[in-house]
Amino acid sequence: MARPRRSGKKKEKKNVPVGIAHVKATFNNTIITFTDLKGNVISWATSGASGFKGSRKSTPFAAQVAAETAARKAQDQGMRTVGIFVKGPGSGREAAMRAIGNVGMKVNFIRDITPIPHNGCRPPKRRRV
């Protein structure tokens, strides 16, 4: 039986030549989001959405695959030049930044915006393994 046609609006192709890549590297996952200069999301990808599960999500290779996926989607929308904001202590920071450059995007700047507490909340207790 034929499936009914999907109604609703199709994703329109934007032409955004300059944008910002936000890389959030946590201990468990890496999230890459490409936005325009106003902050509207153009494309995104995560290590988990790229097919990695469990502890493999936190590897540099998973971050590289996610960054390449998000960068290619952003290039399809016309993005050529990008600035990178990096946040978090994860292992995928460097791999994600390198992957964005290797896809063919021109990187304007790299800025670390990891939030640092001025003696705010008490940190979690140390792990004893």
From Swiss-Prot:
Superkingdom of the organism of origin: Bacteria
Gene Ontology cellular component annotations, sorted alphabetically: ribonucleoprotein complex; ribosome
Gene Ontology terms, MF aspect: rRNA binding; structural constituent of ribosome
Gene3D superfamilies in UniProt: Ribosomal protein S11
Keywords attached to this entry: Ribonucleoprotein, Ribosomal protein, RNA-binding, rRNA-binding
InterPro entries, per database record: Ribosomal_uS11, Ribosomal_uS11_bac-type, Ribosomal_uS11_CS, Ribosomal_uS11_sf
Keyword ATP-binding tagged: no
GO biological process: translation
Chain's role: Located on the platform of the 30S subunit, it bridges several disparate RNA helices of the 16S rRNA. Forms part of the Shine-Dalgarno cleft in the 70S ribosome.
Family membership: Belongs to the universal ribosomal protein uS11 family.
NCBIfam families: PRK05309.1 (NF003698), uS11_bact (TIGR03632)
Quaternary assembly: Part of the 30S ribosomal subunit. Interacts with proteins S7 and S18. Binds to IF-3.
Stored HAMAP family: Ribosomal_uS11
Protein name, as recorded: Small ribosomal subunit protein uS11
